[in-house]
Amino acid sequence: MGKQIRYYVHGHTGKGFIDLLPSNLEQINQIVLIENKNKKVVTALLETILTLLNEEDIEIIQSTLSKDLIDGIIIRNKSLAIIHESLYQANDNGKNIQRVTIPVDEDEDYFSLKDHQKIYDEAYNYFKKGLSIHDQLEKVYISKMDFNKANKVIEQLLQQLFKDVEKKKEKAILYERLFGTNTPDGIVNTVLNLIEPIEKKIFILGRAGTGKSYVMNQVLNKCIELGIDVELYRCSLDPNSIDMLIIRELNVCLHDNTAPHTIAVNDPSIQIIDMYKETVDQQVEKEYGERIKILQKKYKEQMQLGLKVLKSLNSN
């Protein structure tokens, strides 16, 4: 049996809709576009292909519409991608593009992004407000952060990960993805599927603004410097932040193991780096406790309102 990993390339975020598909197709030469407006039909076809190709290592692109739908598959060792036509922005770059049209049953209902744009825009507005409140929360913790201590943590981690690692090649390949996002099914993620085969797991803990993403960004920069390929999983609230890195050449992953993507793994070998304990004055939550509670409450309210709007798509 081949290995399957699942991830998202689209997200409903505090900065609106994002599309990370291009970096995942950059190394792919042959792209098959499935033309059919019904995502259930497309999913059924892709699942049939998955069954037929169960000996291959396959990347499965999850749909942001439902946890039961998939938007495409990539068989990287064959340089082949099969994806829903609606996701692909025409940019051939010399690629071999084929189109497969599945006849549409006129009596069937199908989902159209354009038909539901008002709903998405309403949800994005709530997520944007949530991100703004989250930024305020970050400032509280940043005000009590010791950046010298943070730099020391980073220095030690880089030494641990890259000691004796030689430059691999001139240019690293960077795959930009999401391990989860806000959907009509609620907040979803595929973290366990992605990290299960990774030998060295590093979980980064902390509070908002305590440098979790910054730590991973420094690791990312080192990988790029050394020509090491990286899977970069962006934050679905703020896509400018990083929630996870997977460095398969080193058999290492770094994961922001805080809500809403906390995972419980009973593995004593997991390394924990707690940026709050390591770098922040522990009096901050006593000094600003009431303000923190208010901001957390407002943040959760906005996110829940946004999710409620997305969930209304299930009844349409």
Residue ranges with predicted function:
Residues Q30-T51, V188, E199-C223:
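Glycine-rich phosphate-binding P-loop
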Residues M1-G16, N24, Q30, L50-Y110, ...:
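Conserved nucleotide-sensing/catalytic segment adjacent to the nucleotide-binding pocket
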